[in-house]
Amino acid sequence: MRLDQVARSLLLKEFVSGFALAMRYLFKPKATINYPFEMGHRSPRFRGEHALRRYPNGEERCIACKLCEAICPAQAITIEAGPRRNDGTRRTTRYDIDMVKCIYCGMCQEACPVDAIVEGPNFEFSVETREELLYDKQKLLANGDRWEREIARNIAADAPYR
């Protein structure tokens, strides 16, 4: 063994440098969040649980154009449109999303011309069975009603970048 190797092993240089590094970070503020008691900041572009939105008068926004169904890469969206109404518009009779298939890419939200389908701020939607992850129109509208204020705020915050 050479002399410098002996000196390093006797003086425990690696141990001392590692210990000094640990001591330096010991007294700094912690970077972790005490979840679920503390919630971290989420971006306005966060993609969580899907929701169908309504207009302020209570009418659903979806016009049954089926662009979200066509663009979905996972083929997780199924839409059936009702007959045209007297004013020429259509509404959906069935709007299903298979959340097991969904990859949360956000393409459905980007394709929607009326901001009807959005990915909301909720990320805590655990279930006990796979069947509960098959969202129908009523579940999606209920999500939209529950999260509308936060969804509208996120869309407004993201509007300059769209």
Swiss-Prot record:
Protein name (database record): NADH-quinone oxidoreductase subunit I
Binding site for [4Fe-4S] cluster 1: C62, C65, C68, C112
Catalytic activity reported: a quinone + NADH + 5 H(+)(in) = a quinol + NAD(+) + 4 H(+)(out)
GO CC terms: plasma membrane
Keywords tagged on the record: 4Fe-4S, Cell inner membrane, Cell membrane, Iron, Iron-sulfur, Membrane, Metal-binding, NAD, Quinone, Repeat, Translocase, Ubiquinone
Gene3D superfamilies (UniProt xref): 3.30.70.3270
Family to which the UniProt record says this protein belongs: Belongs to the complex I 23 kDa subunit family.
Chain's role: NDH-1 shuttles electrons from NADH, via FMN and iron-sulfur (Fe-S) centers, to quinones in the respiratory chain. The immediate electron acceptor for the enzyme in this species is believed to be ubiquinone. Couples the redox reaction to proton translocation (for every two electrons transferred, four hydrogen ions are translocated across the cytoplasmic membrane), and thus conserves the redox energy in a proton gradient.
BP GO annotations: aerobic respiration
Keyword presence, Iron-sulfur: yes
Cofactor descriptive note: Binds 2 [4Fe-4S] clusters per subunit.
Assembly: NDH-1 is composed of 14 different subunits. Subunits NuoA, H, J, K, L, M, N constitute the membrane sector of the complex.
Any one GO molecular function term: 4 iron, 4 sulfur cluster binding
EC number in record: 7.1.1.-
Location in the cell: Cell inner membrane
Native organism taxonomy: Bacteria, Pseudomonadati, Pseudomonadota, Alphaproteobacteria, Hyphomicrobiales
Originating species: Methylobacterium nodulans (strain LMG 21967 / CNCM I-2342 / ORS 2060)
HAMAP family, A to Z: NDH1_NuoI (MF_01351)
Cofactor (UniProt): [4Fe-4S] cluster
Transmembrane feature ranges: none
